[in-house]
Amino acid sequence: MNKNKLDNIYKLINNKKINQAQIELSKLGPEFLKNSEYLYLRSKIFYINKLYYIALDTLLIALEFEENEKVYNLISKIYNTLGNKELSKKVANSDLRSTAIISLKSELTGISQK
């Protein structure tokens, strides 16, 4: 059931129905706050709305719960958009991403670490 809700929101985002996706995300309860897929979808909407830094914070929080390739890809894409090509490449590279993410989390004090 929960997966179906998230899949529906993913489809809305891909069909560029961003406002509808935001409404559907807001209907989800607090049990989703630690769900990495929910956080990824939130970040995707933030990215589309050009809220890059909140998207990054949300993605870094998502990594606290589950490491996921698409989360890393979106982080890389955002840093590329922001003009930080070097960090974008590090996050995209599976051999370098761990060090880059740890460094980011230590610099961004609002992100808790396990």
Question: Residue locations for each model-derived region?
Answer:
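Structural marker of alpha-solenoid helical repeat scaffolds
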Residues: E31, E64-F65, R97-S98
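Terminal, low-structured helical/coil segments at or just beyond the last alpha-helical repeat
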Residues: K89-K114
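Start-of-helix register in tetratricopeptide repeats
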Residues: K3, E37, K70-V71, L104
